[in-house]
Amino acid sequence: GCWICWGPNACCRGSVCHDYCPS
């Protein structure tokens, strides 16, 4: 998993944090 992902739309995919992911 990821550490905490910051940002209003941040999410974790696999083991990488992304700034934005669609709902």
UniProtKB/Swiss-Prot annotation:
Disulfide bonds join 2-12, 5-17, 11-21. Keywords: Disulfide bond, Knottin, Neurotoxin, Secreted, Toxin. Expressed by the venom duct. Its main location: secreted. One of its GO terms (molecular function) is toxin activity. The keyword Nucleotide-binding does not apply. It comes from the Eukaryota. GO terms for cellular component: extracellular region. It is found in: Secreted. The presence of a 'disulfide through disulfide knot' structurally defines this protein as a knottin. The cysteine framework is VI/VII (C-C-CC-C-C). This is Conotoxin Cl6c. It comes from Californiconus californicus.
